[in-house]
């Protein structure tokens, strides 16, 4: 059966590719964008299967209206893709509070608002898929993009917990964590930055240079990512988190190895904070005994 999608940030970039892939699969799409005129070619090609909607994800009322449009137009909502987002490369010290808040509001609260509007519909249907387009930046960080990383780490934690809450009534939540994607994201993230204070040249300055050098050369193919999302939307089993791209996989492995090494280095302080009543030793022994059983605390 054809599905009904709501996709945020579908005017261009990855969101546009996701919308095109869903429509090519025979599904219907409520396509959210700040400028709906960008969606005119989709309407011309797919007609009534596309419902453009002006959607500023930082506006909770607009998120509710977009979900309502899906239900009113097609009778249900099967797939939500929270794709809208952007980054801003600038030292935290030099970034205005307004710019910081705008990134967090878009990349995190935008996800919260559309998800909050969609969950009641999916709960009543007893099915649905929610895809959060996060980033490898939700597992690791780079200098110069503090609000983006703050938001993406928040999306991961929020979605992990949400997945547990909604699983009993058939709703699947998957956080997608791509590496570099060949879109205009990097160019936009490096625009309108202040002149760096000299002290930040070694950290933020080097990241900006690398970002600009990779423009148009990122490994991630947005059309292939869109195809993966369409495939998962038709599956009864989805991962809670999915890394996308060899570059992302490599960086995550490096970050996890570095964290494990740091944790081991400072373990003497970690274990120094417990009561000395014998419980620590017994819990440690229990953990060792269950390490191969697949059980969880």
For each of these PLM feature ranges, what is it?
Residues 48, 69-82, 88:
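A glycine-rich helix->loop->beta "capping" turn
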Residues 115, 151:
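Active-site helix of classical SDR
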Residues 135:
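Residue(s) in the substrate-gating loop at a strand-loop-helix junction
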Residues 168-239:
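SDR active-site lid
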